[in-house]
């Protein structure tokens, strides 16, 4: 009896708790009329674009992040989920408070709208370095400004991808 | 060991129960105290750059809010909760950290204990800033008033589209406000819809256009006062227009007067010429008979005349004999007169220099004395002495069916016979009749009678 109680107390409930997030990882996109995206997210994305344009002189190489993650059909919510989490990485950059505010709004606003139940606690958040493998060759000789420039370029592309994916979602909702 | 496992299991389940969704705090305080702490809030976005303002206050102004605090949790950036600041009886929070997506929870706390909470959405309780700089300009040419105002939301990024309400009234009518809704910042009021020479008050307020952002009416803008002109433009009539209108009036009056005066004599005959009346025309052409003129055809009235029956053939021979005699030349005027007298209708035989008398044998009971044709002037006969003698040269409509010319006619002009009375012969002295024959001969050339000649003789 001791073994039975021990198993039921310490075995099954944690197992249930661990398995539930894996079983239910769906995202339910709220705000399906697009009001939140058009009136809040798009405003902040455009502000970020305007702020980045002052500094950027980007290369045309597509980072690896987008080769691994794209806004394919039926994977739009997953892509936005990953992209929004990626935006958080840029908060660590040496940028202005308003820039951080816009980044936080886009990131957290997207996650709120996606309303994904998968929290992904066991996953390591992707770092900025993974997105640009070519940077490994350039880090030896690049200055902090060059690194920042590259990050901004990546951010610019990321924002455009997020915007495109949102438009695709809303267009699909209107067609249905 | 058993006790340890039981304690850990109990603790485990208690942790689960506590960490689970407990619902809103207000459900735990579903008692009379909830009504005491009822409150209302409104938000104002981008009041200072990127900072927003959230203001809350108790509905009951008598409440003792000494130790009461407000807290908002949820839908915030990078933080879980934020506390309000208190200013007199109002609680406000000025921050950039509103996510503007999703619901938040605002709670009233008393010594860190939630007294009441309410779920709110910041974007649904937006109260715009009041419009300002209201101006009214009168346009004299257009007879209207242009109302313009300004709002700070034109430069904002979130709440950009608003509905503005313009309210105006005549100052003596305190509660009779006229209201107009519009989305732009310019309004036109027609002068004819306002009272002249009156003082008006006008003000504006705004509300978010119900798209994503919703909320409440803003405060009224400061009022603007203006006065309408004294009259509706009558006192400032264009002098040129006034002059033209007066001249037009008098011109029309003059034309109407002239039309009435000249209607019968000049206008009507041109517009509606009357058809000639043959009887009247003849009467006019011929002399009017004297009142005491005996025009009866009663044979007894011709007792003074010598009546001779005329043999038709003999008369014809005699007429031909007269016509063959050469006639002396006469002055042109007399020629013309006699020419007019001798004009004939188209039915005359052209080979006749004279006129073939047409005598009914035995039917004409009488005839006038030869040479005394003037006695037998029939009334209404055409005469060269007619009033229109000057005009008769062209188309004097003289129709003769019978004319016997012979010597012995007087010097006077030929009295023509009555056109439709065959059998009446008039004689004219040859000496003076030569021009008559000439005129008769030449009259054939231009002999035609038209109805218009009748008309002219009128």
UniProtKB/Swiss-Prot annotation, chain A:
Disordered: annotated span: 118-143
InterPro entries in the cross-refs: IL-7 (IPR001181), IL-7/IL-9_CS (IPR018049), IL7_sf (IPR038325)
Molecular function terms, GO-annotated: cytokine activity; growth factor activity; interleukin-7 receptor binding
Record: glycosylation sites: 94, 115, 140
Domain of life assignment: Eukaryota
Broad class of the protein's primary localization: secreted
Family per similarity comment: Belongs to the IL-7/IL-9 family.
Function: Hematopoietic cytokine that plays an essential role in the development, expansion, and survival of naive and memory T-cells and B-cells thereby regulating the number of mature lymphocytes and maintaining lymphoid homeostasis. Mechanistically, exerts its biological effects through a receptor composed of IL7RA subunit and the cytokine receptor common subunit gamma/CSF2RG.
Subunit and partners: Interacts with IL7R and CSF2RG.
Protein name according to UniProt: Interleukin-7
Protein species of origin: Bos taurus
Gene that this polypeptide is encoded by: IL7
């Amino acid at each position: 009896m001791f073994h039975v109680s021990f198993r039921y107390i310490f075995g099954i409930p944690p197992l249930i708790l661990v398995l539930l997030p894996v079983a239910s990882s769906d995202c339910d996109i709220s705000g399906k009329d697009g009001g939140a995206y058009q009136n809040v997210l798009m405003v902040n994305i455009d502000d970020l674009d305007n702020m980045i344009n002052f500094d950027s002189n980007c290369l045309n190489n597509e980072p690896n992040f987008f080769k691994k993650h794209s806004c394919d059909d039926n994977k739009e919510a997953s892509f936005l989920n990953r992209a929004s989490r990626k935006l958080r990485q840029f908060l660590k950059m040496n940028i202005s408070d308003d820039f951080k505010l816009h980044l936080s709004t886009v990131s957290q606003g997207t996650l709120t709208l996606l309303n994904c139940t998968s929290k992904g606690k066991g996953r390591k958040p992707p770092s900025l370095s993974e997105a640009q493998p070519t940077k490994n060759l350039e880090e030896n000789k690049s200055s902090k400004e060059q690194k920042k420039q590259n990050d901004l370029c990546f951010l610019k592309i990321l924002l455009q991808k997020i915007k495109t994916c949102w438009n695709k979602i809303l267009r699909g909702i209107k067609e249905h | 060991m058993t006790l340890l496992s039981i304690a850990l299991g109990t603790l485990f389940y208690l942790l689960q129960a506590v960490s689970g969704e407990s619902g809103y705090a207000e459900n735990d305080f579903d008692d009379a105290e909830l009504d005491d702490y009822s409150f209302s809030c409104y938000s104002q976005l981008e009041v200072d750059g990127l900072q927003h303002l959230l203001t809350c206050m108790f509905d009951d102004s008598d409440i003792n809010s000494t130790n009461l605090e407000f807290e908002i949790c949820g839908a915030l950036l990078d933080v879980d909760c934020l506390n309000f600041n208190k200013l007199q009886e109002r609680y406000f929070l000025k921050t950039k950290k509103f996510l503007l997506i999703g619901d938040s929870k605002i709670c009233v706390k008393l010594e860190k204990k939630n007294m009441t909470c309410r779920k709110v959405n910041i974007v649904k309780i937006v109260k715009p800033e009041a419009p300002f700089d209201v101006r009214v300009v009168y346009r004299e040419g257009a007879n209207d008033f242009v109302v313009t105002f300004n709002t700070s939301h034109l430069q904002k990024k979130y709440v950009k589209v608003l509905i503005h309400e313009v309210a105006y009234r005549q100052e003596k009518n305190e509660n009779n406000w006229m209201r107009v809704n519009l989305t732009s910042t310019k309004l036109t009021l027609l002068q004819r819809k306002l009272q002249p020479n009156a003082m008006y008050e006008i003000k504006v307020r705004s509300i978010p256009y119900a798209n994503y952002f919703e909320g409440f009416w803003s405060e009224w803008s400061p009022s603007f006062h203006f006065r309408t002109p004294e009259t509706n433009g009558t006192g400032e009539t264009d002098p040129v227009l006034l002059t033209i209108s007066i001249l037009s009036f008098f011109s029309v009056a003059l034309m109407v007067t002239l039309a009435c005066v000249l209607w019968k004599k000049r206008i009507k005959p041109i517009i509606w010429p009357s058809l000639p009346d043959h009887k009247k025309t003849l009467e006019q052409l011929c002399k009017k008979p004297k009142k005491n003129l005996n025009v009866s055809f009663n044979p007894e009235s011709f007792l003074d005349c010598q009546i001779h029956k005329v043999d038709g053939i003999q008369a014809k021979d005699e007429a031909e004999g007269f016509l063959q005699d050469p006639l002396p030349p006469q002055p042109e005027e007399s020629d013309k007169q006699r020419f007019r007298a001798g004009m004939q209708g188209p039915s005359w035989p052209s080979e006749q220099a004279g006129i073939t008398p047409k005598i009914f044998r035995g039917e004409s009971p009488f005839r006038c004395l030869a040479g005394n044709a003037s006695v037998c002037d029939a009334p209404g006969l055409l005469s060269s002495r007619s009033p229109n003698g000057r005009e008769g040269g062209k188309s004097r409509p003289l129709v003769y069916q019978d004319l016997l010319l012979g010597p012995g006619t007087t010097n006077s002009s030929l009295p023509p016979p009555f056109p439709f009375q065959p059998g009446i012969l008039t004689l004219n002295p040859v000496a003076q009749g030569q021009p008559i024959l000439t005129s008769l001969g030449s009259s054939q050339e231009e002999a035609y009678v038209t109805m218009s000649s009748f008309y002219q003789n009128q």
